[in-house]
Amino acid sequence: MKKEKAVVVFSGGQDSTTCLLWALQNFEEVETVTFHYNQRHQEEIDVAKSIAEKLGVKNHLLDMSLLNQLAPNALTRDDIEIEAKDGELPTTFVPGRNLVFLSFASILAYQIGARHIITGVCETDFSGYPDCRDEFVKSCNVTVNLAMEKPFVIHTPLMWLNKAETWKLADELGALDFVKNNTLTCYNGIIADGCGECPACLLRNKGYDEYMKMKGERN
């Protein structure tokens, strides 16, 4: 464990919760930052606060409602259907979201004396989001370091993992059931197993089933 401080970009979903648990095993001090951008469901904010409290971690909640004004999308507007047309980005894409989140997480890290920033973005289960790519995160890391003259390190523990491998990591961290039962991934705001029908639930549940099958074959 590094005797250093880290900030986790935290939504209360499967990926960011797994990253938080990873951070707690790798850094002496860990805090989380959650962004309120008028998400479709208030439950996301409530779940993030609840998980942080259960794990004994300080949670910073930042108002980013400007994103909703600049980039109307299916994550913030009930009247926009969740869909992904061929050759187009999904309607759940929020332009610049991770750019903004990592920038503000870096500002927070600067203020609280943290060097490490952890985000759960992943390129393997790539949904067409350009700001989930490894090259984007590395570029952003260089930019925030230059902007603040600090040697920040942005970590992406899930970057090359598919959903089954992300469940495997949660299991290796001793928190498979915790992640399964306490996180919110569902676009319809249903905790744990979710609605089972939206794209996020389908991806999450497919990964869980694949991992449990692999785990059963090994045992």
From Swiss-Prot:
Pathway: Purine metabolism; 7-cyano-7-deazaguanine biosynthesis
GO molecular function, one term: zinc ion binding
Catalytic activity from the UniProt record: 7-carboxy-7-deazaguanine + NH4(+) + ATP = 7-cyano-7-deazaguanine + ADP + phosphate + H2O + H(+)
Disulphide linkage map: none
Classification via Pfam families: QueC (PF06508)
InterPro entries in UniProt: QueC (IPR018317), Rossmann-like_a/b/a_fold (IPR014729)
Residue numbers binding ATP: 10-20
Keyword annotations: ATP-binding, Ligase, Metal-binding, Nucleotide-binding, Queuosine biosynthesis, Zinc
Cofactor(s) demanded: Zn(2+)
Cofactor: binding details: Binds 1 zinc ion per subunit.
Protein EC: 6.3.4.20
Chain residues that bind Zn(2+): 186, 195, 198, 201
An individual GO BP term: queuosine biosynthetic process
Function in brief: Catalyzes the ATP-dependent conversion of 7-carboxy-7-deazaguanine (CDG) to 7-cyano-7-deazaguanine (preQ(0)).
Entry-linked NCBIfam families: 7-cyano-7-deazaguanine synthase QueC
Family assignment from sequence similarity: Belongs to the QueC family.
Subunit structure: Homodimer.
Protein name according to UniProt: 7-cyano-7-deazaguanine synthase
Species of origin: Bacillus velezensis (strain DSM 23117 / BGSC 10A6 / LMG 26770 / FZB42) (Bacillus amyloliquefaciens subsp. plantarum)
